[in-house]
C-alpha cells in the first residue's frame, strides 16, 4: 500500500491479533491492489461514494456471497474517534446485520448494484465520442501495437525497465 492511511490502519488494526481474530472469524478478507485491478477499485469506490458521499483509501467494502457490495467505508480507527466508530465495532455490526437482517442486506445490495450501473452508464454516455472517420489506419494501429509489444517487460510487467511506479497526477 502506498497511501498513508493504509499503512496506519495496517499497523493499528490488521497487525493487532484481537482485531485479526474478529476479521478471520466472521469474514473472508480479500485485499485488492487498486493498481493491479483498477476495474474492481472503480466499482468499489463508486459503491463507497454512493453510500457515504466520500471515498478514499484504505477502502473497505462488505459484499454479499454473490459479490454485491452492501456497505463501504474508508479509514476506521482502532478506537472510536475522528467521528468514526472503531474498526472492530464496524466488523461486529456488519456481522450482526448480515446474520440477523439478511433480507435488508440483500435489498441494500440490489439497490446499490442498480445505482452503480446507472452511474456508470451515465458516465459512459457523457464520454461517448461521435462517430467520425478513424483517426488511424489499421496499418498504423498494428505498427503501434508492435512497438508497444517490443517495449513490454515480460518479467516485471509494464513498459520499460523496473522498478515501476504509478505516474504522478500533476
Where does each model-flagged region fall?
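Replace the tail clause
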Residues: 1-170
Amino acid at each position: 500500500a502506498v497511501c498513508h492511511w493504509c499503512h496506519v490502519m495496517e499497523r493499528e488494526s490488521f497487525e493487532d491479533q484481537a482485531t485479526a481474530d474478529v476479521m478471520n472469524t466472521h469474514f473472508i478478507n480479500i485485499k485488492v491492489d487498486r493498481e493491479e485491478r483498477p476495474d474492481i477499485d472503480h466499482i468499489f469506490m463508486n459503491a463507497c461514494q454512493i453510500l457515504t458521499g466520500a471515498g478514499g483509501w484504505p477502502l473497505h467494502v462488505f459484499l454479499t456471497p454473490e459479490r454485491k457490495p452492501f456497505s463501504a467505508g474508508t479509514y476506521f480507527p482502532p478506537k472510536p474517534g475522528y467521528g468514526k466508530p472503531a474498526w472492530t465495532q464496524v466488523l461486529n455490526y456488519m456481522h450482526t446485520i448480515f446474520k440477523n437482517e439478511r433480507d435488508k442486506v440483500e435489498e441494500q445490495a440490489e439497490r446499490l448494484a442498480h445505482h452503480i450501473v446507472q452511474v456508470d452508464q451515465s458516465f459512459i454516455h457523457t464520454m461517448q465520442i461521435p462517430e467520425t472517420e478513424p483517426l488511424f489506419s489499421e496499418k498504423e494501429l498494428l505498427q503501434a501495437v508492435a512497438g508497444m509489444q517490443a517495449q513490454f517487460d515480460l518479467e516485471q510487467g509494464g513498459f520499460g525497465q523496473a522498478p515501476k511506479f504509478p505516474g504522478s497526477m500533476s
